[in-house]
């Protein structure tokens, strides 16, 4: 039997429309559907995973077990400002193992990391 492929990534959240709209703006995705139970966003070019946001009654209470790392096309500082303008907040800066990144929180407090970009010395060959 062939290995399974990943169909989608699902976030549990209190306000799926708000969180889906935030992530669509961050990733350049399109909001495909928003209804009373959730929301769905996809890459407009059909690349990447579909991301689903489902409503749950409880709020976030512990650190995420899984999070997204986003790689800027410019600098980390520019990307941090961009995602802050979309509703994210800065949680902490991390420098270890010869690299650095910034942990951010989406509008419902889910952690994600903004990595260093090409203007910060990152290259795909490194």
Residue ranges and their predicted role:
Residues 17-20, 75-80:
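Short, conserved charged micro-motifs
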Residues 2-8, 32-34, 39-42, 47-54, ...:
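Vicinal oxygen chelate
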Residues 65:
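Short, conserved beta-strand/beta-arch hydrophobic-aromatic motifs that form part
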Residues 68:
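Phosphate-centric recognition/catalysis
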Residues 11-15, 71-74:
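Short, surface-exposed ligand-recognition loops at beta-strand->loop->(often short) alpha-helix junctions
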Residues 17-36:
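N-terminal first-folded block
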Residues 24-25, 80-86:
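Short amphipathic alpha-helices in soluble, non-transmembrane regions
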């Amino acid at each position: 039997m062939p290995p399974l492929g990943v169909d989608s990534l699902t976030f549990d959240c209190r306000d799926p429309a708000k969180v889906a709209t935030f992530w669509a703006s961050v990733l350049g995705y399109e909001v495909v559907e928003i209804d009373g139970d959730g929301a769905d966003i996809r890459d407009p070019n059909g690349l990447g995973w579909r991301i689903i946001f489902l409503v749950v009654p409880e709020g976030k209470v512990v650190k995420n077990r899984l999070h997204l790392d986003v790689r800027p096309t410019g600098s980390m500082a520019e990307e941090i400002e961009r995602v802050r303008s979309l509703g994210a907040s800065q949680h902490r800066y991390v420098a270890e193992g010869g690299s650095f990144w910034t942990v951010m929180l989406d509008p419902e407090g889910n952690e994600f990391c903004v990595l260093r970009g090409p203007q910060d010395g990152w290259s795909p060959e490194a």
